[in-house]
Amino acid sequence: MTSVTVAPLGIDPLNTVMGVRTLSMNAAGARFEQSVGPRFHDHRGQTTLGSVGVVADDAVAGAFYASAPAGSRTVVSQLVVTAAAPLPASGIVTAAASATHLDLETGTGVTDGEIRDGGDRVAAMLRARSFIVSRPVRTELHYGPAAELVIPEQEETTPADELAALPGLTIVEGIASGRVHRGPLAGLTGLAVESVSRGTISGSMTPSNWMSNAVGTVQGGVLLTVADLAAGLVAQTLTEPGTSFRTLDAHLDLVRSPAVDGPPIRVKSDVVRAGRRLALIETRLTTPDGQLLVSARASAQLGRPHDGAGR
């Protein structure tokens, strides 16, 4: 474990863990940057949409929050991220968003934005719907319960040459059994794969205090990360040796907000339809007794050449 000293009511643990920094946030919009790299790679050693889920949520949520009346508490109810240029394996990405519709009478709004890489190429497009809520701020969770924030150690990635000749289903079965490393990002979010078959996976993730937003629930960007990881794994169960996949989008409806000090979250991802080049995927995050928390949809490009070195 790595310890980072946190001044009371100072550093936001969520953004500290995810390497995110605030550049600006005002009525004109919000801008954040994130240092991406191996700590946020999937099991293939690649940066994915899930790697930038938190900074994406920060941007669209921050833009709405900054546009709302002072003192408001806000939550994102729907988050959509669409891939454009490949995300870099390492470096700096910048997420910026602004409010495109604001209805203070009903307490709702729509924000749009984008993520750009270090070369100023658009790597992802963002859209969110947010609401003003009356929930109390959970400062003791959002800013950490103690003077030190413990950051989980970075987990390993299985060398690409050990995976290149394997069918995708075998790789994902290996992750479930522990023969293949689940990757740093899954390790960071606590995503554990428990059962696998072609076109379906199930597992769980355990919330942690560092994942908290201002109202003490798991930030939507963390949930996007988990949903994207699950969608990628189920897409990989369809791939042949020497080929891989790329998730092209993530569309999340955030139905209920899981508490960071709550029970494990169940994760189930299924292929709805798969063609030769594209798979449509649905992922559900639920409570242990089956109550829906997140409904997510994704599409994944299949048949891409295997590349374990990121982009």
What are the functions of these language-model segments?
Residues 34, 79-81, 113, 203-205, ...:
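Preference for bulky hydrophobic residues occupying beta-strand positions
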Residues 1-39, 137-208:
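Non-catalytic linker/capping segments at the edges of enzyme domains
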Residues 175-257:
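Structured core of small recognition/catalytic domains
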Residues 14, 26-28, 73-75, 91, ...:
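Residue-level preference for beta-strand/loop junctions
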Residues 61-94, 232-265:
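Hydrophobic beta-strand-centered segment that forms part of the acyl-chain substrate-binding groove
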Residues 17, 76-78, 110, 188, ...:
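Short coil/loop residues immediately preceding or within conserved phosphate-binding loops
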Residues 6-10, 14-17, 28-63, 73, ...:
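Hot-dog-fold acyl-thioester-processing enzymes
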Residues 62, 74, 87-92, 100-165, ...:
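HotDog/MaoC-like acyl-thioester-processing domains
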